[in-house]
């Protein structure tokens, strides 16, 4: 008798009518065969194999270069379950409308069946997904981003316990592009886009939108967080998980290289984007990175900003929408070295130095295996994960938020996370530079009602006897001239020191209306150009700014309606009172 997976594959094939069906095993031979086919069809271009062995370039359709949030839907039975921050479509309507687009969508194409694991093999925290796609580019990326093929098929066996992901490029028309999530049946449908976040269904679709629903049902957390380990000169390692909206330096922090001044300290990378956290027998939260690769933004990445990322992408990586140098190397704005006189831009057109157009798309990407990262943690594949000492929230704020502060307690920390805001960037299609509320950096990724999500966080605080301490950071504070006043990058290690000291019951702090701030000298500034006055400015809590902030938070909370937990309102009122 056919397994649930075989039955589903038959069902999809009857609808989409591919010319053939291929079951992926994840082997190197399969990968090489697919790459050769894509080189022949022009889906991939070969990069300089001496300098970038095993690396290739993909150029996407110019209308298909970022996540399309306005075409991303949560299809819960009741609209209230999706809540006001998500687009909602009734499941029956979604299946009828988008099902029609899938009819015959794979004619003349190969249908690939990709079984994959989210999380290390054999981990109690791991889950299985299967993506059906007509894009070999998706197969090649999923092989990097997940533990794919035989390893997942073995773990699945004949079980029906897997998240179904159906993807087709369709005709790539933005008018016929939809990314649908069915939380009640744990299914994902995506059509009309080949872009990473829309097409690699293990990533945001499963690991956050569907997994956040599973986490709520099963009492764990699925979060848009990096995970890093900080090892002291004495050999003690502390793990932190941090949530920032896009373009706030998540990947850079996850792969931080401690500067020479922080002699003896090491940073270990577990993940740069997603964390799944469960309660451990010891009363702490333990985290795994469900992914196996990095899907990072290329522009701005250099040996100065992220030396580990630059080393990671030197082999076996796929570059999407970057420019290419005359000798066949990937290039983007912000990479090391002089700007070349001539390049081929992300559209495949000749580009000359001084052109007003960007040579690489602002949201151009690299897909690279995590195991190639020089700072990858020895616990990257640990089925148990790692114990988390601190949660760090942050956003890109020019003036309001200080460099770092600590929440008073868990419930206050949930409020701090719930009121995260940042300025928009190229990773979202839409206006750039607008301040948008992005609670826990999950606004585009929470698969259910945001008010219920805050409630779930509050509940987790009661279920975890030794919860992480909660902090907020802002690397992006500016002075009156609009200049960044904190050096950032590797020097962020100094802030992490203070955070770890606070977790250890050390580290001097003073109370402020918004939380605990480092006391004078609490952050070591030896060897950097940050004087006492600058540090004072970095840690200033401007009451007029914060009063405006409480208004803005109140407006956002008001949009969440009856599902907003009363505790969030109480926390906001307490902040208003403390500000006086």
Question: Where are the language model's segments positioned?
Answer:
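Conserved internal helical-beta-strand scaffold that buttresses enzyme catalytic cores
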Residues: 1-248, 258-580
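Hydrophobic positions on the alpha1 helix immediately C-terminal to the Walker A/P-loop
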Residues: 253
